[in-house]
Amino acid sequence: MTTKNAIIMAAGKGTRMKSKLVKVLHQVCGKSMVDHVLTQVEATHMANIVTIVGHGAKDVEAALGDRTEYAVQTEQLGTGHAVLQAESLLKDADGMTLIVSGDTPLFKAETFEELFEYHQAKGAAGTILTSKAPNPQGYGRVVRNRLGIVEKIVEQKDATKEEQEIHEINTGVYCFDNQKLFAALHEVTNDNAQGEYYLTDVIQIMKNQGDVVAAYQMDDFDESMGVNTRAALAQATKVMQQRINAQHMENGVSIINPDDTYIDAGVKIGADTIIEPGVLIKGHTTIGEDCFIGAHSEIHDMVIEDRVRVTASFLEDSIMHADSNIGPYSHLRPQAEIGEHVHLGNFVEVKKAKIGNRTKVGHLTYVGDATLGQDINVGCGVVFVNYDGVNKHHTNVGDSAFIGSNSNIIAPVEVADHSFIAAGSTITDDVNFHDMAIARARQTNKPDFWGRLPHEPENM
């Protein structure tokens, strides 16, 4: 089997993005553009992967880690100069070398494999991946002769009027014989309008040496989309989102309105789950089978087991076990764990708390820094008061306890199994097994107090 290598171009500053963030680290559906590219390159089982870094090199290296080797382009002298920086790492490598830009997040591994196969079938020294662009403005044009053989690639600024009318464009992806690539790069000059060392000049050098140069035209132009502006980033995100949603639907997920549903690339969703419009599912979220995610819910880095129902709520970095439900208008903050068959109603906030099976927290409640057992009823308006102004404190509530409405639980306290807290209580001490705690002022009625009012209210 022929050895395969890859070079990912990620050294550019991306000035048109007008951003402090390195261009290739801008995200498309939850992953940086260069991460998308690297993931697809990895899927083609490369022997060597080298990423060319320059602007923001440390940030790119931190983002990609040890999944790739790195070569640094200290001066931005063109694409040919950039590739040449990988020579020290690949000079002894045989076989084929793929070159792809780190700002093209929509390429698929299958396309790279097709390019490799075509390159080998043609016995080529270099093969260009091309596409037909509806609007080729800004792209390098692929110039062919009457027999359809590639003559050259000409950049937009160097193209004649006739050449600018060509719609077949260079996608910026190439497959080269590795040894011939670096030999040709040493012959590239910067005698052009930009004063740069163009990688595309390698094509003409190879042709002049009598080597075969081929061009493989891909069908899907969107896949070759490069991102240089915020508008292009939005367009790439739209295409990627359509692709992600289509894959989930193919796997048995019902997405009511795919055009109004945002799902990150790392999300996993089980079959027969229904997702309503306006939903955002982000990060490394996993959703089980037969779930319902209601309209306008936002979910980040969650584990949601089977048959969970989420209604118009915000969930982040927590776990919901099977057959539980939440919402509308509730919030799971980080490190919450919700047991099976739990009911969390409207306007409930849970933070760094564990709630046991079959417990019900109906509405207007804050549960923070607490462990609640099984079969507990938490009434309306209950607050777990966890902060003393300096430190957070923990509360434990045992199985089958009952907490009446409008109660304040002042941590740290222990509320035992089968205990009862009367409505309106402020609990500052432990509540023992089978006890009822009442911590409120006794009601006093004042007879005939109405007549003592300074004046009689109108309409009474």
From Swiss-Prot:
- What does the record's cofactor remark say about binding? Binds 1 Mg(2+) ion per subunit.
| Region described as Pyrophosphorylase | 1-230
Where are the stretches annotated N-acetyltransferase?
252-460
Question: Acyltransferase: is it a keyword of this entry?
Answer: yes
Q: Quickly give the catalysed reaction.
A: alpha-D-glucosamine 1-phosphate + acetyl-CoA = N-acetyl-alpha-D-glucosamine 1-phosphate + CoA + H(+); N-acetyl-alpha-D-glucosamine 1-phosphate + UTP + H(+) = UDP-N-acetyl-alpha-D-glucosamine + diphosphate
Entry annotation: catalytic residues: 363 (proton acceptor)
Please name the CDD domains in this protein's record: GT2_GlmU_N_bac, LbH_GlmU_C
Which positions are annotated as binding acetyl-CoA? 386-387, 405, 423, 440
What keywords appear on the UniProt entry? Acyltransferase, Cell shape, Cell wall biogenesis/degradation, Cytoplasm, Magnesium, Metal-binding, Multifunctional enzyme, Nucleotidyltransferase, Peptidoglycan synthesis, Repeat, Transferase
Cofactor(s) required for function per UniProt = Mg(2+)
**Which EC numbers characterise this protein's activity in its record?**
2.7.7.23, 2.3.1.157
Asked if the keyword Lipid metabolism belongs to this entry, the reply reads no
Which residues participate in UDP-N-acetyl-alpha-D-glucosamine binding?
23, 73, 78-79, 101-103, 140, 155, 170, 228, 333, 351, 366, 377
Ranges where the record places region Linker:
231-251
Give the record's GO CC terms.
Answer: cytoplasm; membrane
Where do the annotations place Mg(2+) binding?
Answer: 103, 228
A Gene Ontology BP annotation from the UniProt entry: UDP-N-acetylglucosamine biosynthetic process
- Return the PROSITE patterns for the record: HEXAPEP_TRANSFERASES
> Per the similarity annotation, which family is this?
In the N-terminal section; belongs to the N-acetylglucosamine-1-phosphate uridyltransferase family.
Q: How does it assemble?
A: Homotrimer.
UniProt cross-references to PANTHER family, sorted A to Z: BIFUNCTIONAL PROTEIN GLMU (PTHR43584:SF3), NUCLEOTIDYL TRANSFERASE (PTHR43584)
This chain's function reads:
Catalyzes the last two sequential reactions in the de novo biosynthetic pathway for UDP-N-acetylglucosamine (UDP-GlcNAc). The C-terminal domain catalyzes the transfer of acetyl group from acetyl coenzyme A to glucosamine-1-phosphate (GlcN-1-P) to produce N-acetylglucosamine-1-phosphate (GlcNAc-1-P), which is converted into UDP-GlcNAc by the transfer of uridine 5-monophosphate (from uridine 5-triphosphate), a reaction catalyzed by the N-terminal domain.
- Protein known as: Bifunctional protein GlmU
This protein's species is: Lactiplantibacillus plantarum (strain ATCC BAA-793 / NCIMB 8826 / WCFS1)
